[in-house]
Amino acid sequence: MAREFSRTRRIAQQLQQELAQVLQRDIKDPRIGMVTVNDVEVSRDLSYAKVFVTFFEEDSKLVEEKLEALTTASGYVRSLVAGRMKLRVMPELRFVYDASLVEGMRMSNLVTRIIHDDEAKQQKHNGKDKTDTADSEGEE
């Protein structure tokens, strides 16, 4: 059982590398553009592979169009990858948009903005305290 799991994991890793190369070098469809293969999950019987991809665009309409183009080209991509990998059964490819990278960038930007706002408030507060202490010293 553990051996089967490690085999599917190894196949998924190799499939991820081969897919990345094929999508980068061999697919010339302008609708797809720059695509990154983040992860691949292969079913236990190797009949399906879920391919998690990201694009440089964040617009949901463009992402849908690119996913549709990838889905249309999946048979061709599958045949190219099958030529590179020596598997008895080449998994059927299902492309899924991986929003984790975009979500991570959004969260990072939020944290950066909050830190910046907090520092600005702290500086404003420290500047106000210095003025108050200067005023109280002048009254004595």
Curated annotation (Swiss-Prot):
Tagged with keyword Cytoplasm: yes
UniProt lists compositionally biased (Basic and acidic residues) regions at 118-133
Which GO terms are recorded in the biological process aspect for this UniProt protein?
Answer: maturation of SSU-rRNA
GO function terms (MF aspect): ribosomal small subunit binding
Compartment(s) = Cytoplasm
Is Signal one of the keywords? Answer: no
GO CC terms in record: cytosol
- The ranges of region (Disordered) come to 118-140
Q: Which SUPFAM superfamilies does its entry note?
A: Ribosome-binding factor A, RbfA (SSF89919)
Which InterPro entries does the protein's record reference?
A: KH_dom-like_a/b, RbfA, RbfA_dom_sf, Ribosome-bd_factorA_CS
Q: Which domain of life is it from?
A: Bacteria
PROSITE patterns xref list: RBFA
Provide this UniProt record's keywords sorted from A to Z. Answer: Cytoplasm, Ribosome biogenesis
**Subunit record text:** Monomer. Binds 30S ribosomal subunits, but not 50S ribosomal subunits or 70S ribosomes.
The record's similarity note reads:
Belongs to the RbfA family.
Its job: One of several proteins that assist in the late maturation steps of the functional core of the 30S ribosomal subunit. Associates with free 30S ribosomal subunits (but not with 30S subunits that are part of 70S ribosomes or polysomes). Required for efficient processing of 16S rRNA. May interact with the 5'-terminal helix region of 16S rRNA.
Read off the NCBIfam families from this record: rbfA
Q: What is this protein called?
A: Ribosome-binding factor A
